[in-house]
């Protein structure tokens, strides 16, 4: 991070748009489902990337934080779900969708890496940006700016998640400072 313009790339997913952060059960000890955990994790990743950029900017750092998603990439994600133990009906449906439709709607793993490579190496890049495939539904195609789900724009939620993560991981990133929360943004945190 000491380079003239360090860049942090965080992998998210289209599924972040279905993610919800439950502050009372962040680690899903009471309500674990495979797909729910995946969606929440990918939302948390995007919130983290955007919060890191906000904090780096406030601290006067040249760090650039961006996130990217691979779209629907043909990897083992759809074929290895049965090894995850007891699956809910919803998880089984998602598994069937992945197994049947991924080959039709998706792209190979190499093409899925394009948005992440774009985020990591191309100039100019939007600090705090989010990138994914340009094709139908952002499922495949060359990289472009991706659509950010509503909850991923919640600055209050991002701040809460950042501070909670610091406590859970026993780390302190106070050197980055704490940016003010934009009160003009609708706070969604209590609704999720």
Question: What spans do the regions from the language model cover?
Answer:
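Rossmann-fold NAD(P)H-dependent dehydrogenase/reductase core
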Residues: 1-91, 167-182, 188-191
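Short amphipathic alpha-helical segments at helix-loop
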Residues: 29, 33, 37, 100-101, ...
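C-terminal helical subdomain
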Residues: 41, 92-146, 155-159, 163
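A generic alpha-helix propensity feature with a strong bias for hydrophobic helices
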Residues: 73, 106, 155, 182-183
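Hydrophobic transmembrane alpha-helices of multi-pass solute transporters/permeases
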Residues: 125, 151-176, 181
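Short, solvent-exposed polar/charged micro-motifs at secondary-structure junctions
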Residues: 139-142, 185-189
């Amino acid at each position: 991070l000491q380079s003239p313009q360090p860049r942090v790339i965080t992998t998210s997913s289209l599924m972040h748009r279905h993610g919800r952060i439950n502050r009372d059960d962040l680690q899903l000890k009471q309500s674990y489902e495979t797909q729910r955990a995946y969606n929440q994790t990918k939302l948390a990743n995007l919130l983290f990337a955007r919060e890191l950029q906000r904090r780096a900017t406030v601290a006067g750092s040249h760090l650039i934080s961006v996130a990217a998603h691979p779209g629907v990439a043909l990897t083992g994600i759809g074929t290895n779900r049965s090894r995850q133990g007891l699956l809910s009906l919803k998880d089984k449906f998602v598994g069937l969708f992945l197994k049947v439709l991924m080959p039709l709607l998706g792209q190979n793993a190499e093409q899925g890496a394009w948005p992440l490579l774009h985020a990591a190496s191309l100039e100019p890049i939007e600090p705090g940006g989010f990138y994914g495939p340009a094709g139908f539904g952002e499922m495949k195609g060359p990289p472009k700016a991706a659509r950010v789900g509503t909850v991923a724009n919640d600055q209050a939620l991002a701040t809460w998640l950042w501070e909670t993560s610091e406590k859970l991981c026993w780390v302190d990133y106070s050197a980055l400072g704490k940016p003010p929360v934009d009160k003009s943004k609708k706070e969604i945190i209590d609704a999720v």
